Each structure stands twice: as C-alpha cells, then as structure tokens.
Amino acid sequence: MMSSITKKPIKNYLECGCNIGRNIDQLKLAMPSLVPSIIEISKPAFDYVTSHHNFEHAFNGAILDSKLPNSHFDLVFTMGVLIHINPEQLIDHLRHMFDYSNKYVLIGEYFNRTPISIEYQGQKDRLFKRDFGKLFIENFPVE
C-alpha cells in the first residue's frame, strides 16, 4: 500500500471506529502532515480522543448516521470494526466508506473465506468473520 501512496499521495484520512485513537497516534508519528478525521460510536472513547487530538471532522455516532462530505478523504479506513457489524447492514457501512473516499479504502479485519459468526465476550451475533476485501471489491467499482 505504501508504494501506491507515493504514486497518489494522501493529505487527509478518516478512521471509522477510532476508539481512543491508537491508530491516529501512530499515523501522527509516521505522517505528521496528514489531516485526521474520525467517526467513533462510543461517547467515552470519542471524548477521550477529541481531547487529545485536533480533527477536521469528528462525528460521535454510527457511520450510518454520519453526514461527512463525500469524496473528501484521501484514505478511509477501519481496523477491527466491521467484524462487529451485523451482516445485513455491512454493505451500507461499506458504501459510506466508499462514498467518503476519493482515493483509498483500507479494511483491516479478521479474515475467513466463508462468513462465520463467532461468540464474542459470551454473546452470540457480535463478531462476524469473512473476506471483507472480496465483499468490497464485488460491490464497489475499484481500481
């Protein structure tokens, strides 16, 4: 991915589900000139991360409720978030990510060749593994 970024550099990014901002901390160290934006559903995590970082856009709520500018972000990414989205709503979440991006979408999630639901913290239907990349490519026009 980094070799692609040198061909089409990025100036800003949106993290969907940033929690307390660990990825933001690392991106700030690696690429300090990037302008960050976030979507975070947890109010305590949102309050924490917004007290430690400045954002172009910061939305506290679900991605499906967000109204950020389309085609605005050079990179839209999520890490360990989509695995918790009910499969019936997954395409809608991916569509928001696709719509917000103007260059790159990065999905870092648990992988399984076939969709599977796994018990998570003693609860059923809270963690879903699948091939998220394949699902994205099959549903959105990507290069």
Model-derived segments and their meaning:
Residues 77:
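A conserved beta-strand element that flanks and buttresses the S-adenosyl-L-methionine
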Residues 1-68, 88-92, 96-143:
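Class I (Rossmann-like) S-adenosyl-L-methionine-dependent methyltransferase catalytic domain
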Residues 83-85:
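A short His-aromatic
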Residues 80:
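Nucleotide-sugar donor-binding/catalytic module of glycosyltransferases
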